Curated annotation (Swiss-Prot):
It comes from Bos taurus (Bovine). It is found in: Endoplasmic reticulum membrane. Residues 40-517 are lumenal. Residues 2-18, 533-555 are cytoplasmic. GO terms for biological process: attachment of GPI anchor to protein; GPI anchor biosynthetic process. The keyword Transmembrane applies. Coiled coil: none annotated. This is GPI-anchor transamidase component PIGS. The gene is PIGS. InterPro entries: PtdIno-glycan_biosynth_class_S. The chain crosses the membrane at residues 19-39, 518-532. The keyword Disulfide bond does not apply.
Length: 555
């Protein structure tokens, strides 16, 4: 009986050892790999090497320029050399990781018969009408006509002319170095019409050191797919003023042509509103010398915040909102004028705030109060108001007056409020800005993934990253080829895809699941099972080790 009990005990011990080994094998062979696979952070492969290469991206902005020479514009020997091509390239000195070079590719040729006839006229406007911009002329390209030194098309004291279209006129010279002298004049003109250091600096203002550029360079709006424009009439004293403004007609006559010409840069929506009892929030000061009130320049920044609370929240808007306010001061503070930093009245009686909008103070004619009962009827001169708002709108989009070369004839924009080459220059700047933004976003995403290991990257997010990288590369290629329209479209796609990937909500799913929380969940689950298995394995190890050291019996 004792032998039978001992045998049963030994069998039970062996069975326990086998069970412990079996459980340990299952945990190690199946459990740990399965747990590791099911709890790992999924990351679709990303083009890290290509993203890293974007930091050293070199942009070459090519501007195609067609230079047309009329008869007697250059010596006969030089005319026989036509046609040929000259390339002028220079680097834009910006302290930024993107290296930008501007390349002017000038294709010289002789004038055709209809061009000779148009340029032989005595009026530049008539000549420009005959030299209507060909429909096949691409965005970003320019045409420069070189006329003879004695041609009466331009005033004799003028050496060049810049028109509203993609056209310019330069006076020639009969000199043995004619091509070199005229070439320098052409470069001055095309730089004024296309790309300058200031234009690109304003576009990259958010990416450059703050002490590098003044606040004026940060005035333009950031590039966006769309913009919302709101015109507001502020009447703080409706008991004294019955204000009427034809905002619909003004938008149709003055604003809509400008926005239609600017449609290539984004989509626009326009609305208007009238706000009663809306005050500026800053008490004007009284000037006894002129019996008027004024707002000093240092108080203008404090005007916006109190008014903005009445304008309606723009938080729900997907696009930047531009506010243009027409303020009719109350009777107790009339007339009201805005002063500049030197204390002089501002001619337009208006001011603007970068990336926000503008405010214009509209004073009621004092004669309206003579013999009239309150409230007096006020008819707003919308032409005068819209001239100010359009000028502010141009500044907010970074469309400033060009830096004209010496002795250059320039008439300014027509009824559209913007010249064709100004739109091209805006698209150049927006393309560079979009590429800089997309590159920064992709680089930040790659750095973030390197620092935080539990960020999930799904396949759709990875596809957006690949799409953004490809769009950046395509935009850079199109810019170097002088294809402005396709380059701008590709740059917009790059920004959209990169930001869609960076701000995808799925990246945050495991971001707030640190390691201490993992241990708090796994220990109660695995510890009760792991302790018996580990103790059994340890006991088996000790017994096995003891059996190895036990000496064998000898007869």
């Amino acid at each position: 009986m004792a032998a039978t009990g001992a045998a049963a005990t030994d069998l039970e011990v062996v069975r326990g050892k086998r069970a412990a080994l079996f459980f340990a094998t299952v945990v190690i062979v199946l459990g740990l790999p399965l747990w590791w696979k099911t709890t790992e952070t999924y990351r679709a492969p990303l083009p890290y090497s290509q993203i890293s290469g974007l930091n050293s991206l070199k942009l070459r902005l090519m501007v195609p320029v067609t230079v047309v020479f009329t008869q007697e514009s250059v010596p006969l020997d030089d005319q026989e050399k036509l046609p040929f091509t000259v390339v002028h390239e220079r680097e834009i000195p910006l302290k930024y990781k993107l290296k930008i070079k501007c390349r002017f590719q000038k294709a010289y040729r002789r004038a055709l018969d209809h061009e000779e006839a148009a340029l032989s006229l005595g009026n530049i406007q008539e000549a420009e009408a005959m030299l209507a911009e060909p429909s096949e002329q691409a965005e970003g390209s320019l045409t420069v006509y070189v006329i003879s030194e004695r041609c009466s098309l331009l005033p004799q004291d003028m050496m060049s002319y810049i028109g509203p279209k993609r056209m310019a006129v330069v006076r020639g010279i009969t000199h043995r170095e004619a091509f070199n002298i005229i070439g320098r004049r052409i470069i001055q003109v095309v730089q004024a019409m296309s790309l300058t250091e200031d234009v690109l600096a304003a576009a990259l203002a958010d990416h450059l050191p703050e002490d590098k550029w003044s606040s004026d360079k940060r005035r333009p709006l950031k590039s966006s797919l769309g913009y919302e424009i709101t015109f507001s009439l502020l009447n703080p004293d409706p008991k004294s003023h019955d204000v009427h403004w034809d905002i619909e007609g003004a938008v149709r006559r003055y604003v809509q042509p400008f926005l239609s010409a600017l449609s290539a840069a984004g989509n626009f929506s326009v609305d208007s509103q009238i706000l009663y009892y809306a005050v500026l929030g800053v008490n004007p000061r009284f000037d006894s010398a002129s019996s008027s009130y004024y707002l000093a320049a240092h108080s203008l920044p404090h005007v916006i915040n109190p008014v903005e609370s009445r304008l309606g929240s723009s938080a729900a808007s997907l696009y930047p909102v531009l506010n243009f306010l027409l303020y009719v001061p109350e009777l107790a503070h009339s007339p009201l004028y805005i002063q500049d930093k030197d204390g002089a009245p501002v001619a337009t009686n208006a001011f603007h705030s970068p990336r926000w909008g503008g405010i214009m103070v509209y004073n009621v004619d004092p004669k309206a109060y003579n013999g009239s009962q309150l409230p007096v009827r006020v008819e707003v001169d919308m032409m005068r108001v819209m001239e100010v708002f359009l000028a502010q709108l141009r500044l907010l989009f970074g469309i400033a007056q060009p830096q004209l070369p010496p002795k250059c004839l320039f008439f300014g924009p027509k009824s559209e409020g913007i010249m064709t080459w100004e739109l091209d220059r805006l698209l150049w700047a927006r393309s560079v800005e979009n590429l800089a933004t997309a590159t920064t976003t992709l680089t930040s995403l790659a750095q973030l993934l390197g620092k935080i290991s539990n960020i999930v990257i799904k396949d759709d997010v990875a596809s957006e990253v690949y799409r953004a990288v490809a769009a950046v590369q395509k935009a850079a290629e199109e810019l170097s080829s002088g294809h402005l329209a396709s380059a701008f479209a590709a740059s917009q796609e790059a920004v959209t895809s990169s930001e869609r990937a960076f701000f995808d909500p799925s990246l945050l799913h495991l971001l707030y699941f640190p390691d201490d929380q993992k241990f708090a969940i796994y220990i109660p689950l695995f510890l009760p099972m792991a302790v018996p298995i580990l103790l059994s394995l340890f006991k088996i190890f000790l017994e096995t080790r003891k059996s190895w050291k036990k000496p064998e019996k000898t007869d």
